[in-house]
Every structure is written in C-alpha cells, then in structure tokens.
C-alpha cells in the first residue's frame, strides 16, 4: 500500500539562511512543503524565492510567540511584541482568545496578499495551535476556509470534536529534531508511522544555512545537519523503497 509523505519545513521567512535552506531542501532533496511566518523579518525574501520554486507547497505558520503581531494584542504582547510567556498565560487560563482569533484572520489575509493564493494548510510556531484553548479556534477557521491543518494527535484529547470537513494527515511527527539528526532517525520515523498504520504522514523539519539570525536560535547547527540529511540521494531511495510517495497537504 502506497503511503503519502509530507516533509514540511517550518519557519519560511524567519531569515535568509532559513529561506535558502528550505529552497535547497526542496530543489535537491525531499522537502515538499513549507510554512511561512508572515511577520518574519525575511518574509519578502521568502516570497521572492518561492516564485522560482512552483513545486513547493506553502502553508501558513501562525505566529503568537515571536515578533510583532499584525493586530493590537494588549493581552498577549509585552512592549508591543509576542513572546514565550504565552505558556504562562495558557496555564493560568488567561489567553486573550478574541485577540488570537482576530490575529489569525489578519495573518491569513496577509499571507494571501504576500503569496497571491491561500495557504495549503495551517500550523504554528512552537505548536501553540495545539493549546487546548487555541486549537478549536484554529480548527474551525481551517475548516471554514477549506484548508488543511497540522494535528499532533498525541496531546489532543478532544479529537472527536473536530469539524467534519477538516483535512489533515493521519500522522504527524516532530521527532526529526535535536542533536542526533541522521538518515536513520528519519527512516525510523517512517517505520514507526507504518507500524501505526498511518496512510499519510507529515514530518516536520527545519533545514537552514547558518546566518546571524539562526546563530541566535537555541536550535542552530542541527538545522544545517537536517539540510544535509534531507538532500541525501540515498534517503530519497529509502523512502520510495518503504512505499511512500512524496506530496503535500494538497494531496490529503
């Protein structure tokens, strides 16, 4: 049985080094999909590069933890910027859900302005769309707009409440991440999904060339290792040998 594999590179628009890495991993590797941060400092550069890579499916990386929001968010920003204190607000059940709803719609419209089309799917920076308070908002929005959504089903307790017309892959893995990146790790992710019986799988990745922005990230040099693995000719062969075909959320 043939299975669908979506290799999605997060953080398109984060920096020029990130953008170049994603394009390289698409052009000469197995990356088929990416998600863009519309408030990223290099988003215009990402848009420009994407015009020469029509095969790259582009979704939206909803941002609530970095940079400036597109709308007024006094309940979530500090000194006008977003940050990781969103976790504390979530634990205190103090998230400004109306502000988040408005920001989601604004980022979505901005994506369409930038790329000239709808995103193929939605996910989020630091997986904040999987917060129990935020997930219903994003799931409903994706269903209404007719676009797919990344769903990590492991922390999801209300899977039965998903909109009937919401599209997603059967499986999702964030395991291709960290200091032990290798071809063997990527293939183990596929084998684990096969054992679960997933007919479609998204694997998250972050391939990049190192620049000054990436150097400031807590996750820096492994991005370059990811790029090396994702452009390996032997990996592409091993994926096909396991019965997977590369695709995007347009195939879900």
Curated annotation (Swiss-Prot):
Q: Which cysteines are joined by disulfide bonds?
A: none
Q: Where in the cell is it found?
A: Cytoplasm
Cofactor dependence is on: Mg(2+)
Question: What domain of life does the UniProt record list for this protein's source?
Answer: Bacteria
Residues binding Mg(2+) = 61, 125
- Please list the reactions this protein catalyses: N,N'-diacetylchitobiose + H2O = N-acetyl-beta-D-glucosaminyl-(1->4)-D-glucosamine + acetate; diacetylchitobiose-6'-phosphate + H2O = N'-monoacetylchitobiose-6'-phosphate + acetate
Q: Give the stretches traversing the membrane.
A: none
Pathway(s) per entry = Glycan degradation; chitin degradation
Keywords on record: Carbohydrate metabolism, Chitin degradation, Cytoplasm, Hydrolase, Magnesium, Metal-binding, Polysaccharide degradation
Q: Which GO terms describe its biological process?
A: chitin catabolic process; diacetylchitobiose catabolic process; polysaccharide catabolic process
Keyword Hydrolase present in the record's keywords: the answer is yes
A molecular function annotated in GO for this UniProt entry is:
deacetylase activity
Q: Which family does it belong to?
A: Belongs to the YdjC deacetylase family. ChbG subfamily.
Which NCBIfam families does this UniProt record tie to the protein?
Answer: PRK02134.1 (NF002559)
Under the subunit heading, UniProt states: Homodimer.
Q: Under which name does UniProt file this protein?
A: Chitooligosaccharide deacetylase
Species the sequence originates in: Escherichia coli O139:H28 (strain E24377A / ETEC)
Gene name as annotated? chbG
